[in-house]
Amino acid sequence: MKRFLLCSFALVLLYPAGIDMYLVGLPRIAADLNASEAQLHIAFSVYLAGMATAMLFAGKIADQSGRKPVAIVGALVFMMASLLCSRASEGSLFLSGRFLQGVGAGGCYVVAFAILRDTLDEHRRAKVLSLLNGITCIVPVLAPVVGHLIMLRFPWQSLFYTMSAMGIIVGLLSLFILRETRPARLAPRDLSRSSPAAESLVNRFFVSRLAITTLSVSVILTFVNASPVLLMEVMGFSRGDYAITMALTAGVSMVVSFSTPFALGLFKPRTLMLVSQGLFLTAGVTLSLAHTNTVTLFGLTLICAGFSVGFGVAMSQALGPFSLRAGVASSTLGIAQVCGSSLWIWLAAILGISAMNMLIGILIGCSIVSILLIFSVAPNRSVAEHEEIPYQSRS
């Protein structure tokens, strides 16, 4: 079991590392490529577009050919794309590399969740996904620090050499440590129950959890996207104050994420999901009524706590009905989360909604819709029946 957890954690970490590692070198990258920082900020959107593109195909391929081949290819693509970025001499080549980085990270991301669905029952999976969320929260804090230390002695290209090395490590883990977990053939009496046709992506329960997780990701990405404006322009924080504040909010996320597995031993998953949405609603009301920086910071802290306590549980429930189509389900969740959050941020920008109102709107909207879905669509018996699925154990 340890090998599956190690490989899943490593596969997921490529995604946030690809976002955060290079940001500290953005001014130098822009200068060397004769591009403005504003032009290169599109690299974030290009990276997400690459992830979404990979997710369209990676899940289905993983269900048909296995998790291991997709993990190896994804890590290889991430490694080569990182080298392409390091060799870029102009903006378009750099953006091409960023797109391919997203493709590699997206494939690995999908496989990681499929592996956890294959190897863990719902109770353990919810705990592991909460821990995974906490570990992921470390990356946005550590990656810029590591990038800064690297750039004290080396050029910006070294940031992408580092990411390339990460791709190599993940590829080696996938090649030599990871074992295939794609479900083995089922007994004839189980085929009708667990066939791809029965594991529909349009069943009410999956759609409800897809909506909840997509709205939750929209909340946290809106917070990340709006935080520079809120903290430095509206609240008057310096760059140093901003970095400290974001580190503290990431610390809150880690503490809550690492505490959630223990909470699952005391409370039902539904209770934690309701607590999560209650925290979102409280954060939205707090921010709308805040007149001091202290109250605003309290509201922002509630956002991080709310996301950390409920997201892993909701993701675990979303994957629960799927045994033979875990890859496709994971892909669908990833695409919805990336595209849904990007659409909200884009629409808010087009409509001229302020950063604070953008955040308040998604907080209140997410909490109300999610609470209604939690009460109206509960896990049914068939979800539990899909949990115990034998998997292949081939190296």
Swiss-Prot record:
The record's section on InterPro entries has: MFS, MFS_dom, MFS_trans_sf, Multidrug-R_MdtL
Any one GO MF term held by the record is:
transmembrane transporter activity
Could you tell me which Pfam families the record lists for this protein? MFS_1 (PF07690)
* Top-rank taxon: Bacteria
Membrane topology, from the record: Multi-pass membrane protein
Keywords, sorted A to Z: Cell inner membrane, Cell membrane, Membrane, Transmembrane, Transmembrane helix, Transport
Q: Which GO cellular component terms, listed alphabetically, does the Swiss-Prot or TrEMBL entry include? A: plasma membrane
Ranges that cross the membrane: 4-24, 42-62, 69-89, 93-113, 131-151, 158-178, 217-237, 247-267, 271-291, 295-315, 333-353, 358-378
Matching CDD domains: MFS_MdfA_MDR_like (cd17320)
The UniProt entry lists the main location of this chain as membrane
Q: Does the keyword Membrane apply?
A: yes
**SUPFAM superfamilies cross-referenced by the UniProt entry:** MFS general substrate transporter
Enumerate the Gene3D superfamilies for this protein: Multidrug resistance protein D
What is the annotated localization of this protein?
Cell inner membrane
Q: Family, per the entry?
A: Belongs to the major facilitator superfamily. DHA1 family. MdtL (TC 2.A.1.2.22) subfamily.
Return the protein name: Multidrug resistance protein MdtL
Q: What is the lineage of its organism?
A: Bacteria, Pseudomonadati, Pseudomonadota, Gammaproteobacteria, Enterobacterales
